[in-house]
Amino acid sequence: MTLNKISHKLIFGAVTVATLLTGFASFQTQAQTTANRGIIVSPAIMELEADRGASYEFTVRVENDTPESEYTMRSLVNTFEAGSEEGIPVIKELPEGNEIRNWIKFDQEEFSVSPRDSFDSVFKVNVPDEAKPGSYFLAVTYATGDAETVVTNSKVVVEQRVAALLFVTVKGKVERQVEFKTFATNKQVYDPFFDGIKLDYKIGTEGNVYLKPAGNIFVGNNIDKPEATLALNPNDSFILPNSNRSFGFVNQPKLNIPLLTQKVEGEREVDINRPWFGSQKITANIIFADSEGKLERKEVETEVLYIPWKLGLVVLVAVAAAAGAYFVAKPKFSKE
């Protein structure tokens, strides 16, 4: 049975009832800070589209935001991969002999940073002639203290690390497939005045290049004149190859009455004009370059139904209360 047929039956039932009753994820592009040391790097995320055999220079500012301590920093090259579907990356050490380790050459591998001061770390990215097309993921890491955990005077000293993430894509023929894995609301039927809406969607990629999704979400039955237009990827988040990334938004109800209002949890709250009765489409599109470098567009859609049954219940209770008060008061007035 299609949603339209369900909608028509529910709408008919709702009209009958109404008659009777009278009635919201990265890599985040924020500077990363060590847990207790106040060491900050910026920019925290860098992108490079590179030619084979070319060299590129970058500068990362390493800031000591502590009031008293001076730190000696070591420059390291690590890699990172997708962690959770919420976009938290996992930084991993490169194994000995990994060629990517040699792509980065620091002008100064070790340096000191005084309190409330900073140091500009300059390094070059040298892309080998034989590098294969595709994306490479480098974590330019700065570490305080020794290279290993040591025990001194019964105290364990562990180095602190902070990293700037570098996305390198070597030009050439790449492989990329993109699709919506999921696109759905927490339910299909809502009271437009009292129920919160939660939309969750997941985008997946396959191939050898990362993706920064571009596109929009349109709320409304006419995509040319939508009730709301929302960014598909509001934080410019990245999706690494062969992984999924979860997104979503919430729209909270306008009325707040105990026992009736049902709010939803989510980090991204948006404003949507809901019809008081009927159906409403939510459509999303994503635009990306395919393996041939041509722009491709994919679209997905869901539909929700609004029935103001809770408002009808409020009206029914109000009418019943008024009627009860009238019949209680009527004998008294009759005697008078």
Where do the PLM segments sit?
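Short proline/glycine- and polar residue-rich coil/turn motifs
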Residues: E49-R52, F111-F119, N235-R245
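Membrane-proximal extracellular "stem/stalk" segments
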Residues: K173-K310
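Short acidic, flexible loop segments centered on an aromatic residue
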Residues: E70-N98, Y142, G204, N208-K225
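N-terminal edge beta-strand
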Residues: T33-Y56, K181-P192
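Ligand-binding face of N-terminal immunoglobulin V-set domains in extracellular IgSF glycoproteins
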Residues: E57-E63, E70-V77, P89, R101-S154
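C-terminal single-pass membrane-anchor helix
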Residues: R297, E301-E336
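Short, solvent-exposed loop/turn segments enriched in Ser/Thr/Gly
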Residues: S42, G53-T59, F119-S121, P133-A139, ...
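Short beta-strand and strand-turn-strand segments in soluble, beta-rich domains
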Residues: G38-S42, G87-E109, N221-N235
